[in-house]
């Protein structure tokens, strides 16, 4: 079809350019800009560089860091990829500066952070995941039926939308209120909100299990320990240039903790269902097939820690293996959306981290020592 247009139409701008012009959303844009990348494009430079008086043109992207490319007019510079060019767009649900600061003062400030700029990059990255939708433009009546890349919903009300724009690469919604993101209200909540548990958040994220613990269809009991527990187990944050990575000592310096090790740590610290820590004696199977919790009178340990003292005097050693647990509640003093969280502190460091402890063959020890004096085998 051909239409006659009797006026000059103002070209639409990218979501990124719209955000830049709206000072009320500068904090959100600062978060997003942390993940900007600039890649030289040879073809674009050759075809259009002279027209704008430059030798080199760069693509301003965010996808290398897992975020939608809200600064690019088109999802791909390849004009032959028509299906992608004709279908891919994005939607941004950006909280205003006031909304972000209100949320910060209520939750993050109480959790040990001094300002929005003091937040760890992983927290801001996941916050951005909760505020973007990649793949297509979203209209208001569709928002309640979609989920983000981590599987959680967008919890704001349409009445919170005070600003909106259709852009050349998607849609922009400006929010006057920033409610608790769904993922922050799960058993991962303490790790998102409290600085003391930040390394637990990295363990979950790098184990690729974050989406699993986002669901509210399953009820969990999760153990977390303070950052000092990870340090006892030779784990700490290492800068990767854009953010941080949970690392440990390697042959040539610090290296990222393996996904398999972190999966064992996180799964071994999680039980499906409720746990009664005040029982006189109970054993609970964790999500890690080789890890069990031994629970006794408000304290607990794991089979790995317990097995490490085989051959020693049980009367003096066993009491030292059990550690007290303390429930970590939400801001209302209750459980989290999909279960309960308990903090533990152990001289052994992080449960499930075997490095640094001597674990000889259990079969050899049992046959050579004869552990009839231990009641818990």
Positions of PLM-derived features:
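Mature, structured domains of secreted/extracytosolic soluble proteins
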Residues: 1-377
């Amino acid at each position: 079809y051909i239409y006659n247009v009797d006026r000059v139409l103002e070209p639409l701008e990218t979501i990124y350019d719209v955000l830049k012009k709206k000072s009320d959303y500068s904090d959100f844009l600062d978060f997003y800009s942390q993940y900007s990348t600039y890649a030289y494009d040879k073809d674009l430079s050759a075809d259009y560089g002279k027209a704008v008086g430059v030798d080199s043109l760069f693509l301003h992207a965010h996808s290398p860091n897992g975020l939608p490319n809200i600064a690019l007019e088109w999802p791909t510079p390849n004009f032959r990829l028509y299906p992608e060019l004709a279908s891919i767009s994005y939607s941004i649900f950006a909280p205003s500066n006031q909304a972000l600061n209100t949320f910060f003062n209520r939750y993050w400030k109480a959790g040990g952070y001094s300002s929005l700029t003091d937040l760890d990059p992983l927290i801001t990255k996941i916050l951005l995941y909760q505020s973007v939708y990649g793949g297509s433009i979203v209209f208001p009546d569709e928002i309640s039926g979609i989920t983000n890349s981590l599987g959680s919903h967008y919890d704001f009300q349409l009445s919170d939308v005070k600003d909106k724009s259709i852009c050349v690469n998607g849609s922009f919604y400006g929010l006057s209120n920033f409610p608790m993101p769904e993922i922050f209200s799960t058993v991962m909540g303490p790790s998102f909100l409290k600085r003391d548990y930040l390394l637990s958040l990295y363990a979950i994220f790098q184990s690729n299990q974050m989406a699993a613990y986002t669901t509210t269809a399953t009820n969990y009991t999760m153990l977390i320990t303070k950052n000092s527990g990870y340090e006892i187990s030779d784990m700490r944050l290492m800068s990767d240039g854009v953010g941080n990575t949970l690392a440990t000592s390697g042959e040539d310096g610090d290296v990222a903790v393996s996904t398999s090790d972190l999966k064992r740590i996180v799964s071994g610290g999680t039980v499906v269902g409720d746990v009664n820590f005040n029982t006189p004696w109970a054993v609970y199977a964790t999500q890690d097939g080789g890890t069990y919790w031994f629970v006794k009178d408000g304290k607990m340990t794991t089979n790995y820690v317990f097995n490490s003292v085989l051959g020693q005097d049980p009367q003096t050693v066993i009491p030292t293996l059990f550690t007290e647990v303390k429930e970590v509640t939400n801001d209302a003093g209750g459980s989290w959306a999909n279960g309960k969280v308990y903090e533990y502190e152990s001289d052994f460091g992080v449960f499930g981290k075997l490095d640094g402890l001597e674990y000889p063959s259990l079969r050899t020890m049992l046959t050579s020592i004869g552990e009839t004096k231990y009641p818990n085998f």
